[in-house]
């Protein structure tokens, strides 16, 4: 399995280095739910500003404040501890007066707004995230500037970031140990983290191998293609290749890569053979996903940061702004720009 730091770069390995997350204020994330609260219902949606707090810690503190079970507090996604983040949490508080959230006191955390909502906020139920990042101590401004232009046009690999695999790859190591020991894992969080890490690592490996090909973004017979911004996909046939290639070139369609698991992968013929060969040696992780009945799915191979802009504060400091769809990683954008330095460059929650 290729380590995250050695996965193929779309625009070649960066020439220079830089500092990511010199302090939490250098990594700002604002959740975009894509909808507004209903204004009624048994749930309460809260928009929370946090600095130096991980999501689970805040959710548990909120549950304690509301005197409800921790499982009654949900969120759409985990957010980095070592960052300034605005995210939505959801608490099930039926048939009660609206609590006085001004009394909710937690260091590094502030409730910005809240409203009633009819439905529980589920994991992944957000449109995307807006990022404002500051990269410092950049050693090669010209190279970074060239890469930013290239990313605006050509995107970046849609890799799962190193955070997905835990500090020092602990989640992936946990998955491997679990697969080899065949021992039951009763901790639901561990199961979720480990299975997610296993499937993400296999996806990254498939994308890594495809990007080695000079014609990586050329549609081949049996590719699974996705309408940009949509979750469903369809299979390319040889008769349609010219027209499908035109639509891929115009970014109307996206070539996808497999999130392996049980059931059909989605690709067929030449494309399926390539994906199977790309992870043929990773039998342990594939067996784990089959054993645990994790359903196979698809994910776009490339990621195009939206609303990308940048501002050089000086020759060694640049501020980046961009928006990514849910499930995509800002660190996968940054790795195409610089070789990152800093204690928190890849740290997970």
UniProtKB/Swiss-Prot annotation:
Q: Which amino acids does the record list as binding substrate?
A: 27, 129, 329
GO annotation, cellular component aspect = cytosol
Q: Which Pfam families match?
A: TruD
Keywords on this record?
Answer: Isomerase, tRNA processing
* Substrates-to-products reaction catalysed: uridine(13) in tRNA = pseudouridine(13) in tRNA
Q: Where is the active site?
A: 80 (nucleophile)
Q: Which GO terms describe its biological process?
A: tRNA pseudouridine synthesis
> Which residues does the UniProt record annotate as the domain TRUD?
155-303
Q: What family does this chain come from, according to its entry?
A: Belongs to the pseudouridine synthase TruD family.
**Per its record, how is this protein called by name?**
tRNA pseudouridine synthase D
Native organism:
Salmonella newport (strain SL254)
Q: What is the lineage of its organism?
A: Bacteria, Pseudomonadati, Pseudomonadota, Gammaproteobacteria, Enterobacterales
């Amino acid at each position: 399995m290729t380590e995250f730091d050695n996965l193929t770069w779309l625009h070649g390995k960066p020439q220079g280095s830089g500092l990511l997350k010199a302090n939490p204020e250098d990594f700002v994330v604002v959740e975009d739910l894509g909808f507004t609260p209903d204004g009624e219902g048994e749930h309460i949606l809260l928009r929370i500003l946090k600095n130096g707090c991980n999501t689970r810690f805040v959710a548990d503190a909120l549950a304690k404040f509301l005197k409800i079970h921790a499982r009654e507090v949900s969120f759409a996604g985990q957010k980095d501890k070592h960052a300034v983040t605005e995210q939505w949490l959801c608490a099930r508080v039926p048939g009660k007066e609206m609590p006085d959230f001004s009394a909710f006191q937690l260091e590094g955390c502030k409730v910005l707004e809240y409203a009633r909502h009819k439905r529980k906020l589920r994991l992944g139920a957000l449109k995307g995230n807006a990022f404002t990042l500051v990269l410092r101590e950049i050693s090669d401004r010209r190279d970074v500037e060239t890469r930013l232009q290239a990313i605006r046009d050509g995107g970046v690999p849609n890799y799962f970031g190193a955070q997905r695999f835990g500090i020092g790859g602990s989640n992936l190591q946990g998955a491997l140990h679990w697969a080899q020991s065949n021992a039951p894992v009763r901790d639901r969080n561990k199961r979720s983290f480990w299975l997610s890490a296993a499937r993400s690592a296999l996806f990254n490996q498939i994308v890594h191998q495809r990007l080695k090909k000079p014609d990586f973004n050329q549609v081949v017979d049996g590719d699974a293609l996705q309408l940009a911004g949509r979750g469903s996909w369809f299979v390319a046939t040889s008769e349609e290749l010219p027209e499908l290639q035109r639509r891929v070139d115009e970014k109307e369609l996206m070539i996808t890569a497999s999130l392996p698991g049980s059931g059909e992968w989605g690709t067929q013929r030449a494309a399926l053979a390539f994906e199977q060969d790309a992870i043929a040696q990773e039998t342990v992780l594939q067996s784990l996903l089959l054993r645990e009945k994790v359903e196979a799915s698809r994910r776009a191979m490339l990621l195009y940061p939206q609303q990308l802009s940048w501002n050089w504060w000086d020759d060694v400091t640049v501020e980046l702004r961009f928006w990514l769809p849910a499930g995509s990683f800002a660190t996968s954008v940054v790795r195409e720009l610089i070789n990152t330095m800093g204690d928190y460059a890849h740290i997970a929650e």
